[in-house]
Regions:
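A short beta-loop-alpha structural element at the N-terminal edge
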Residues: 1-15
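Short alpha-helical
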Residues: 12, 56, 65, 112-113
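Conserved GNAT-fold acetyl-CoA-binding loop/helix
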Residues: 14-44
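C-terminal "cap" of GNAT-fold acetyltransferases
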Residues: 38-39, 64, 100-115, 119-140
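Conserved beta-strand in the GNAT
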Residues: 48, 54-62, 69-74
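Conserved acetyl-CoA-binding loop-helix of GNAT-fold acetyltransferases
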Residues: 75, 81-94, 119-120
C-alpha cells in the first residue's frame, strides 16, 4: 500500500534526487550535488512516498495564490514504471485542491521519460526551451 508522510530526512531525500537526476545533470552540464539539492528543497513542502513503510519516492511542492508547483517528483529506480509516479501526482492534486489552488504546474527535462506520465495525467505544455517543458494542469 502506498502512503505519504512529511519528509523526515532531507539528506536522504536529496541523495535520492541526485541519484535519479545525475544523468540529466551530466547531460546538461548542471553543477549540482546533494548539498545543493538539500539547500534548494529545505523551504519546500516535502513528502516521502512510502511502500510498506519504506521510502521509495518524494514529492516537493511550492504554492502561490492560484497554483501548486510540483518542484520535484522522484521515484527510486527500482520502483519506477509501477504506478508510483501516477499515485504521487494524484497526491499532488489532492494537496493542491485542499490548499485552494486551481492549477498544478511543473517543469520537466525534455529528455525525461516522466514527460509521458505528465501528458497521460492531463498536463499540457505551456512553453518550452532547449532543456525543459513547462507544463500545467487545471484542477476542478
Amino acid at each position: 500500500m502506498i502512503s505519504f508522510q512529511r519528509t523526515e530526512n532531507l539528506s536522504a531525500s536529496a541523495l535520492m534526487t541526485y541519484e535519479n537526476m545525475r544523468s540529466y545533470y551530466e547531460h546538461y552540464a548542471v553543477d549540482w550535488d546533494c548539498s545543493k539539492i538539500e539547500e534548494q528543497i529545505r523551504d519546500l513542502v516535502n513528502f516521502d512516498l512510502l511502500l510498506k513503510g519504506e521510502v521509495v519516492g518524494a514529492i516537493r511542492l511550492a504554492f502561490d495564490n492560484d497554483s501548486c508547483y510540483v518542484r520535484d517528483l522522484q521515484v527510486s529506480h527500482h520502483h519506477q514504471n509501477k504506478g508510483f509516479g501516477a499515485a504521487a501526482l494524484a497526491e499532488c492534486e489532492r494537496l493542491a485542491i485542499n490548499s485552494g489552488t486551481n492549477r498544478l504546474k511543473l517543469r520537466v527535462f525534455r529528455i525525461s521519460p516522466a514527460y509521458k506520465l505528465y501528458v497521460r495525467s492531463g498536463f499540457v505544455v505551456d512553453s518550452e526551451d532547449e532543456r525543459f517543458y513547462n507544463m500545467s494542469k487545471m484542477l476542478s
